[in-house]
Amino acid sequence: MDQERKLQFLLSIAAETYAISPSLSSHYLRRMFSLLEEWNLETDPKTLLHGCSKCGSLFIFGRNIKLRTISSERKARTDLKKGEVSRLGTNLEINCLVCSYVHEIPLGVPLRLHQSKQALRAKAIAESSSTKLESRKSAHNAKVKQRQRLRASGLNGILDRKKKKDEVAKSTSSLSLQDFMSPI
């Protein structure tokens, strides 16, 4: 077997045997991590989420692993401008609850959340007082329609609809007993 297939096999067999024998599963994971070191291969961050590289326990989220994201503090970085606060890198901290081993994986810099200044200016120009009034009117109309729907869906609305159906049925039926007896 080539190296990647062997590592993948060890990981899958560790996951399958955990329910039967956790110690055997731990042995397979420790063997996988020792082969990674022996072959001088880089450990994929996704691989570190499967099991602990120190004790070999298979991670079950909420039972024997604790994950959290850690971001750099603004106060610790004095060389940054105020606008670059959101560009600080974050790390994923993996804490094995079996052996208390902590491993950090860099997640990189998060994407910018704010819009560009040109887009903000264009948005401000597009919004004028007339559009605000129109939006208020449409919001008011939506509330009125919602109230009407709630009234119609209530008990009184159901009874009113049933009365209307009965009236329509009476007016359109030509074979009622009153209609038949009235000419006599």
Swiss-Prot record:
GO cellular component term of the entry, any: cytosol
Region (Disordered): 154-184
Signal sequence segment: none
InterPro entries reported for this sequence: Rpr2/Snm1/Rpp21 (IPR007175)
Polar residues composition bias: residue spans: 170-184
GO biological-process terms attached to the record: endonucleolytic cleavage in ITS1 to separate SSU-rRNA from 5.8S rRNA and LSU-rRNA from tricistronic rRNA transcript (SSU-rRNA, 5.8S rRNA, LSU-rRNA); tRNA processing
PANTHER family: RIBONUCLEASE MRP PROTEIN SUBUNIT SNM1, RIBONUCLEASE P SUBUNIT P21
Official protein name in the record: Uncharacterized protein C16C4.19
Organism, scientific name: Schizosaccharomyces pombe (strain 972 / ATCC 24843) (Fission yeast)
